[in-house]
């Protein structure tokens, strides 16, 4: 699963979309400005704006997701490479089972051995993020076939998450500098991979807590971080 650790948190409260006059024109501009500046807006109003923004954006997000997926399947070196290697070891991932859809959960996508790959159009912000997420999920698909991953085994889960975040480009150094600045420059790549792997493993029903997830990730770190198959090295 590809987690979106740096996007706005999803609101779990039950909200309804505001009236049409609040979703366009001057009123929408005013609400957008309040949200961006944090001035004159309550926490409840922030949650309502986030809900309205997602509802207002859904049709375009789904259209963009499908268009960007088509582009990546034809032109992205990492996606084409991973699709080819999944196919070589018996996988059946294709455009027919890579689906753009709306997700309630706070994630960018997911992989299921029988269902294929899900891309969460309402959380994906641009073409290049979709490329990272799709590559991430294709690494999971490869691992399930190549290494017989069993997600009830936390070490298996940790290893495939380490590899997926490492090989997908999600933790490329310039992304991390944008998020966290220049501090600990030499450790940013590894820190990002560990953070994402721990977050994913901690959500596993068989994991007791974050401390256990961190322990498992550290246990398998050396072998999994050094395994770049099917790539020769980390390119992205």
Curated annotation (Swiss-Prot):
It is a peripheral membrane protein. The keyword Mitochondrion applies. GO terms for biological process: mitochondrial protein processing; mitochondrial proton-transporting ATP synthase complex assembly. The active site is at 137. GO terms for cellular component: mitochondrial inner membrane. Keywords: Hydrolase, Membrane, Metal-binding, Metalloprotease, Mitochondrion, Mitochondrion inner membrane, Protease. A divalent metal cation binds at residues 136, 140. It is found in: Mitochondrion inner membrane. Its EC number is 3.4.24.-. Belongs to the peptidase M76 family. This is Mitochondrial inner membrane protease ATP23. It comes from Debaryomyces hansenii (strain ATCC 36239 / CBS 767 / BCRC 21394 / JCM 1990 / NBRC 0083 / IGC 2968) (Yeast).
């Amino acid at each position: 699963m590809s987690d979106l650790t740096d996007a706005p948190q999803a609101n779990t409260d039950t909200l309804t979309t505001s009236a049409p006059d609040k979703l366009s024109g001057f009123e929408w501009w005013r609400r957008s400005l309040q949200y961006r500046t944090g001035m004159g807006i309550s926490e409840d109003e922030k949650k309502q704006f986030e809900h309205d923004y997602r509802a207002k954006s859904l049709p375009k997000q789904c259209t963009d997701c499908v268009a960007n997926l088509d582009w990546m399947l034809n032109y992205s070196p990492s996606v084409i490479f991973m699709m080819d290697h999944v196919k070589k070891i018996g996988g059946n991932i294709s455009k027919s089972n890579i689906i753009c859809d709306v997700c309630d959960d706070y994630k960018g996508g997911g992989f299921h051995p029988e269902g294929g790959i899900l891309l969460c159009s309402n959380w994906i912000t641009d073409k290049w993020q979709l490329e990272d997420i799709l590559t991430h999920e294709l690494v999971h698909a490869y691992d399930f076939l190549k290494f017989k991953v069993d997600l009830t085994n936390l070490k298996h889960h940790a290893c495939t998450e380490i590899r997926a975040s490492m090989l997908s480009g999600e933790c490329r150094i310039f992304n991390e500098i944008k998020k966290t600045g220049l501090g600990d420059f030499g450790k940013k790549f590894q820190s990002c991979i560990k953070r994402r792997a721990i977050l994913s493993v901690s959500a596993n029903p068989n994991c007791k807590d974050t401390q256990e997830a961190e322990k498992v990730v550290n246990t398998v770190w050396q072998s999994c971080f050094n395994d770049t198959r099917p790539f020769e090295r980390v390119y992205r």
